[in-house]
Amino acid sequence: AGDFRRFDVYLPGTGTELAEWSMIRPELNKLDIEIQKLLKDAQEINENFSTDRLLEYLDNCVVIGCKLIKVHPFGDGNGRTIRGFINKLFEDVGLPPIYIKANERTEYHLAMNKANNEENYNYIKGFYRYKVCDSIIEWKEKTKRIKVKKYN
């Protein structure tokens, strides 16, 4: 667990070309530069909030997630691990975590395939923006129920 794969893999039915196992470290090194920029952006957003910058940050997190999927560094659990990483990046700027429900998986996979096969990130960005809003609404509803229980 936690070791990079030492074999080539593919995602059946997606058409997505994944990094050869020998290219995992070089590809991750390239992505590290973008991730370091994201971490600085998060700091700046927390120091000087701007909705436009927050949305740009969200979109950039999503693109990084797509690129990490194409590297596919582990033999198993890449999707869960990468979504967890994106959720951590969201948390760094106060955004809620997102969870993909079973009935949303097809839409998510179609958007991810469009991003990874055509470099068209619009659908996956839109999906994540919707999911962030969805998470905010769910959180507000949950806190209302907690308040009602607390005062009854």
Segments from the language model and where they lie:
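FIC/Doc superfamily catalytic core
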Residues: A1-D76, R80-N152
